[in-house]
Amino acid sequence: MMKSFFSAAALLLGLVAPSAVLAAPSLPGVPREVTRDLLRPVEERQSSCHTAANRACWAPGFDINTDYEVSTPNTGVTRTYTLTLTEVDNWLGPDGVVKQKVMLVNGDIFGPTITANWGDWIQVNVINNLRTNGTSIHWHGLHQKGTNMHDGANGVTECPIPPKGGSRIYRFRAQQYGTSWYHSHFSAQYGNGVVGTIVVNGPASVPYDIDLGVFPITDYYHKPADVLVEETMNGGPPPSDTVLFKGHGKNPQTGAGKFANVTLTPGKRHRLRIINTSTHDHFQLKLQNHTMTIIAADMVPVQAQTVDSLFLAVGQRYDVTIDANKSVGNYWFNATFGGGLACGASLNPHPAAVFRYQGAPNTLPTNIGTPAADANCMDLNNLTPVVSRSVPTSGFTPRPNNTLPVSLTLGGTPLFVWKVNGSSINVDWDKPIVDYVIAQNTSYPPQANVITVNSVNQWTYWLIENDPTGPFSIPHPMHLHGHDFLVVGRSPDQPAGVPQTRYRFNPATDMALLKSSNPVRRDVAMLPANGWLLIAFKSDNPGAWLFHCHIAWHVSGGLSVQYLERPNDLRNGFSQADKNQHNNNCNAWRAYWPTNPFPKIDSGLKVKKWVGEHPDWYIKN
């Protein structure tokens, strides 16, 4: 029995190898560069004070110090987009390897960048031309204040959009500004290509000259994500085959593919919008011979902080500035893995992009430079948001109703099952939680993992403990829909290379570790291995909001709860138009689902299984 446990633990850790301007869609099987022009706002604005010398100003009455949760520009503009999902078999990937199947958005493995100005409305028509998979698109990090039904979490805020031409419209306000991304919350679409980036233009905490645009970084696998999920439910997470930077990557075995290139203008300051769109891998990032200055974390503007390297967890975003003040030449932008294999691994020993100064020869850098410092799989916890928020730590007392233990069950079928508070989430696609809200039915299924929050405009505290009584624990990037949360505290960091010892929250000693005055605020934060994380958010946004690990294999395995915030206010706030669209989409899904002969094998929030010659083989429960 002990031998079986250690074998399972080794597998889990991976210690055992096993209306905007859109670019033209790529031809099937022909990879191309994924580029978007984000050097200017969507359109020139009249009398704008937002200049290279003064990025803090945005428009009369709105600047970097404006609290966007209180005041947002009323632009009167709606940005419209259409996203069409398709499947392609035997697709030639960017590293020269043919993949069995990919799912594309407007013909790309990265869909178009959704671009808007602060205060605009965004309207996206999603057309599902997949063969048998439903879909839902989540607009990661956008609060959806007053538009909970547009959050894109199937089984929670909507039924899936049925395949073979089903469609629905998402409409929401760009209340925040900064950098984010969108992705499927159904099936294997997240890992198989249904992903894209979001830019909401707005003020910044430091001046800069050039906006380089989005820079998504992702782990990349030759196997379909559906197959990988089944493998990780019964074994360890495999290393990625390579890492893609803005859609490009090198094959470490054959040399096929190419490095992504970013051009720097000598003497200028550049803004780079870095996004981790991975399914599993976290990255330690370093631009050789340069520093990066952080100006935003997860769409929260922060006071400038300069770093030599940067840890980026799955789902996180950082806006940074880079000064092109070095010798004209070519420099590696490296991604490494710290904190042991539980933090990520790749078969590519040198995942990198090339940052090239204008005037430099078109050659690869010759100096790999110094390795990035190992952050031990933990994110920065000392950033200072520009708009301050404070929370009284005296209001927190750990109790069973605000403590969420994360645990792993070993030895069943599947081998690994993730639980929060002793329960593994399993949503019902046919009856999302908002249906219960509309019907005033509070008999939620136990497996829906619903936590009801009835308080109004009050700080709510949540202590997440990582396997506090179990034998095994790894870090988790915890993501909350509908809110930014305050990182009030976490268990003490361990030095790099030193495994985290078991550390449960102890009020007698750990209350002194909590930060009440303007702590880090974001929507994805790392839960330390063997440790704890204390977050707080204010109950000011009625909705059904998922809180989950953003490692696709873990949320697929059940690591999620959903906060049902102020259900009565939520029900009263639904517009008739939203309810009509919701009902029409659910009716279309319910008509389709009984005709689909293929299985639902996981939580319903991420990936599903492909088997044999039937890549969408789902068994209905």
UniProtKB/Swiss-Prot annotation:
Binding of Cu cation 2 occurs at H140, H183, H550
A Pfam family that this protein carries is: Cu-oxidase
Q: Which domain of life is it from?
A: Eukaryota
- Name the GO cellular-component terms: extracellular region
What detail does the entry give on cofactor binding? Binds 4 Cu cations per monomer.
GO terms of molecular function: copper ion binding; hydroquinone:oxygen oxidoreductase activity
Q: Which reaction does it catalyse?
A: 4 hydroquinone + O2 = 4 benzosemiquinone + 2 H2O
**Changes after translation:** Proteolytically processed at both its N-terminus and its C-terminus.
Gene3D superfamilies xrefs:
Cupredoxins - blue copper proteins (2.60.40.420)
The protein's matches in CDD domains, at most eight in alphabetical order, are given as: CuRO_1_MaLCC_like, CuRO_2_MaLCC_like, CuRO_3_MaLCC_like
* Induction context: Under oxidative stress on the mycelium by aromatic xenobiotics (guaiacol, hydroquinone, benzoquinone), and by copper salt at a concentration of 1 mM (growing mycelium).
Locate the Plastocyanin-like domain: which residues? 78-201, 210-367, 430-566
What is the annotated localization of this protein? Secreted
Binding-site residues for Cu cation 3, renumbered to this chain: H185, H481, H548
Q: Which residues are glycosylated?
A: N133, N261, N276, N289, N325, N334, N401, N421, N441
Q: What protein family does this chain belong to?
A: Belongs to the multicopper oxidase family.
**PANTHER family to which the protein is assigned, alphabetical:** LACCASE, MULTI-COPPER OXIDASE
Function description: Probably involved in lignin degradation and in the detoxification of lignin-derived products in its natural habitat (herbivorous dung), which is rich in lignin of grasses and straw. Probably involved in melanin synthesis and in perithecia development.
What's the subunit arrangement here?
Answer: Monomer.
Identification of the protein by name: Laccase-2
Q: Which organism is it from?
A: Podospora anserina
Taxonomic placement: Eukaryota, Fungi, Dikarya, Ascomycota, Pezizomycotina
